Amino acid sequence: MTTRTTGLPRKDLFDIPSDIVYLDGNSLGPPLRGSAQQAVEVVSDEWEKDLIQAWNSANWMSMPRIVGDQIAPVIGVQPGSVAMGDTLSIKAYQALAAALDIRPDRRVILSDSGNFPTDLYIAQGLIDTLDRGHKLATPPPDEVEEHIDEEVAVVYLTHVDYRTGRMHDMDAITKRAHECGAVTIWDLAHSAGAVPLEMRQTNTEFAVGCTYKFLNGGPGAPAFIYIRPDIVNSIRPALTGWLGHKDPFAMDLRYDPAMSTERFRIGTPPVVQFKLLHFAMKIWDLVDMSDIRLAATRLSELFIEEVERRCPILDLVSPRNASNRGSQVSFASDEAYSIIQALIDSGVIGDFREPNILRFGIAPLYLDENDMVRAAETLEHVMKAEIWREPKYQVKKQVT
Ligand SMILES: *Cc1c(COP(=O)(O)O)cnc(C)c1O
């Protein structure tokens, strides 16, 4: 995996059953070919043979830093500025606690009503824990900018809306926030690996994201947090675990944070997950994000056109203008849940989101025009033949 190519898709790099069209890589990316072997090797070559020594001999303890340096170019930041571990919910908590600490005199956390629930729950929980009278404001996404004022401590937003794919103008919002003296946190859950990002240029203080969506790190893959390097050493981490200490193995009784991004580490890294993510990240040496974006736009437009022509009863809820949309396309229907279940049974995997959304992730790494047309044709068949009416498609599963 060394030469870059503009050739997309790269289906050859993935293990996806050939009879399905996978439009859910925005929720769980598929495995890269060879992922299973990676997991086997960690267990049989490293853990089994070296036991505890593998923390050194197989570089286990350095995996968070190594993988953080693979994430950095994908989100447009400098090496050494990304800490890895835990889940996105926890990284969001760390960022938010730190941001509130930077603006102790202000009380408003500004998010929006389209944000992913966990981001909002984390804020609500932190507000309760701090008990200092903070308020969470959640105006509609298109009104966020006008709510930024001198009361706002932190602007805490998800760049690409998980339901509709609507994309915030990150540069404009960050600039406005900074003009008002607010700190910014961008959640890149649906952006990293999907759209070109230049987080360093935005000058945001924090960015967080997960790696099991468009970065294909596998279920439970560790999350990331970027902290602007000029402020990282003045930040008091909220979750002060031993691996964020400046010398974990000194076993000091007093917490003293690492003088680097490492202070945002907490505890023992999930090594198997890290190795899988490390392997999956190699793909970004082969492809260019601007090519990905171009291809995603082309595929999305084709899909919208095909679906609207074949299923006019479905309403597009994603922005029609590609520049305001991330890498997903969503439609609304009262029967969205049943339609998606019937579609999945017919080999086209998308997903359902409350209250009435059919959601399709467009990942050009492993999707082409034929896949888009086949997905639209299958959707048309499910709708016209009313296959979704079958009782088995009405039953709600635990994970939708
Ligand atoms: C997927 C997603 C999450 C998931 O958080 P986890 O802690 O990894 O479960 C959080 N926020 C957003 C915006 C997401 O899209």
Q: Where in the sequence are the language-model features?
A:
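Pyridoxal 5′-phosphate
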Residues: 1-400
